[in-house]
Structures are given as structure tokens and as C-alpha cells.
């Protein structure tokens, strides 16, 4: 593994999205980035910040502007690559822990049998993590965030997934199983 932490970018760029009713959604995403960057600096952890937009596009520039509001004084780098190379999956696979808010990439990470941390600092009941316990944090406290992240990083994958006390393949099937299920359904129609 190349990285300790993969932070999933979740910029609040579209005022017409499903999270419009959550007034602190954007600030929650910003706070997650602040906490993650601070922790990585303090603990000398290797971070990859995975963007959802392509570099030098309008949305890519807006994504950087969004995080500049929260991380401006800190130097930060968002990896913005063409989706055709599946950069988010690559970075998740190369990381010990994936951190985010509501991104489907967190479920994808579970499907890849990778550790995740859902950060729901918004307090909104509209946002529900499919996981709880070690895999979720709700209190917007840097001290609690740091403690939880370091705890997860100290656990083996087996101990982490055993502590979830759920069948994580019910949250997201491994990619090979997803392909098999789709392939089997297509064959039924042939």
C-alpha cells in the first residue's frame, strides 16, 4: 500500500443536488478535508486526495476553488484524472483507509475489502451511514476524529471487518461478484 489515507473529494458544487436541504453540507465536506490534512501533517501520514473532476476542466477548477476556501493556507493537491483510468478505485486500493462523507466511493471501498470512515458531521437525519461503530464518526471534533482514524489504522483488515459485526458484502458486493451477477442476468435474456 502506497498511502495511509485516501480522502474522497466531495465538493458541493451543484446547488440543485439532493443535499440542498442540508445547510451545512458544504462546510461538513470542508471540515473533513481540514481534519484529514491536519492529521496527516501531525502524524506524518501519506495522503492521496482523490478528486471527482478532471484537471483543467471547469468542474476541476471549481473543485479546487471549493477546497481552497477550507485549505487555502495549507498546501493541498487534489488528484484529478480522467475517469477512464478509474483513478479513484486505484487510489482506494493503494490506501489503508478511505475517508469521506456520503460518497458512493466509500461503499465501493467496502466492496474492495478496504477500511473506510464515514464522517457525518452534518447532524442531518437525511444522511445515514450504512455502517456504524468503528466505521462512522458523527461528532465534529478533531480530537475524536484523530483518535478514530489512528485506531482504524492500527487494526488489521480482519479485525476492522470483524468489528463491524455485519456482512459487509451486503453493503457492496466485491467488483468481481457485481460483474458475475450482471453477466448472469444478461445471459437469462439471451
Regions found by a protein language model. Give the residues of each.
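Short, surface-exposed amphipathic charged segments that create phosphate/polyanion-binding patches used
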Residues: 1-6, 88-97, 152-156
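Conserved catalytic-core segment of nucleotide-activated headgroup transferases in glycan assembly
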Residues: 1-67
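Hydrophobic/aromatic beta-strand patches that form the interior of the parallel beta-sheet core
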Residues: 6, 48, 97-99, 117-119, ...
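Residues at the C-termini of beta-strands that transition into short coil/loop
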Residues: 9, 51, 82, 120, ...
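Alpha-helical elements of Rossmann-like donor-binding domains used by nucleotide-donor carbohydrate transfer enzymes
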Residues: 34, 144, 148, 181-185
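Donor nucleotide-activated moiety binding/catalytic core segment of transferases
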Residues: 52-112
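Catalytic binding pocket for nucleotide-activated donors in carbohydrate/polymer assembly enzymes
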Residues: 66-68, 72-73, 104-173
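C-terminal alpha-helical cap of glycosyltransferases
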Residues: 172-190
Amino acid at each position: 500500500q502506497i498511502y495511509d489515507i485516501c480522502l474522497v473529494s466531495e465538493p458541493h458544487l451543484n446547488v440543485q443536488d439532493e443535499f440542498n436541504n442540508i445547510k451545512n453540507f458544504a462546510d461538513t465536506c470542508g471540515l473533513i478535508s481540514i481534519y484529514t490534512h491536519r492529521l496527516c501533517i501531525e502524524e506524518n501520514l501519506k495522503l492521496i486526495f482523490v478528486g471527482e473532476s478532471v484537471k483543467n476542466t471547469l468542474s476541476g477548477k471549481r473543485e479546487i476553488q471549493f477546497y481552497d476556501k477550507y485549505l487555502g493556507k495549507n498546501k493541498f493537491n487534489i488528484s484529478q484524472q480522467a475517469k477512464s483510468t478509474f483513478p479513484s478505485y486505484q487510489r482506494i486500493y493503494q490506501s489503508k483507509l478511505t475517508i469521506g462523507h456520503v460518497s458512493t466511493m466509500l461503499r465501493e471501498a467496502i466492496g474492495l475489502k478496504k477500511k473506510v470512515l464515514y464522517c457525518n458531521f452534518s447532524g442531518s437525519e437525511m444522511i445515514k451511514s450504512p455502517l456504524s461503530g468503528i466505521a462512522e464518526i458523527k461528532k465534529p471534533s478533531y480530537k475524536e476524529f484523530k483518535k478514530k482514524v489512528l485506531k482504524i489504522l492500527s487494526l488489521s483488515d480482519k479485525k476492522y471487518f470483524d468489528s463491524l459485526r455485519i456482512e459487509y458484502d451486503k453493503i457492496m458486493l466485491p467488483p468481481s461478484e457485481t460483474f458475475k451477477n450482471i453477466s448472469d442476468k444478461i445471459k437469462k435474456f439471451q
